[in-house]
Amino acid sequence: MVVQIAKALGARVIATAGSDERVAKAKAFGADEGINYKTEDVAARVLKWAPEGVDMLWESRRETDFDWAVGLLAKRGRMVVMAGRDARPVLPVGPLYVKDCSVHGFAMFNYTAAEQHPCADAINRWLAEGKLKANIDRVLPLREMAAAHQLQEENTLRCAGTLAGKIILRP
């Protein structure tokens, strides 16, 4: 949804994914450019499209490579980190502060219902306008709830790479 929300807000989006199929999916959801981080030089490709660096970098990997990420940020660029609760990566303070960059953590569970309300309104409006579409990876019968949970856990905690979207359970 991050790609679609960024597009709805008017951003130019460069998305990375771990397979050509996932790159194609990101582009289908609105990414202007897509990079397979397993087969391509991400930094070279990003800096080709944004020679001064990017204004915003949204990081959802559990183990963030801050050296790499800060190198891609433009002056006063911002980075949002939304994964890796137990991660302890090295933070390159020098390059970060010299460029006036900032890093922000984002965890939805820290926001109150009142804080989430305007975001929910915007998301509902974009859904109604067709600007957002659900990214469904698979649909499973409700009786396979344990398997669905295991699949989600394998991909969230162990980076299995076998899930690229939401799991829907049907009664």
Where are these regions (language model features)?
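Mid-domain Rossmann-like dinucleotide-binding core that forms the NAD(H)/NADP(H) cofactor-binding site
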Residues: 1-40
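Short amphipathic alpha-helix with an adjacent loop that forms part of the alpha/beta core around
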Residues: 41-52
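Rossmann-fold dehydrogenase core element
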Residues: 75-82, 91-134
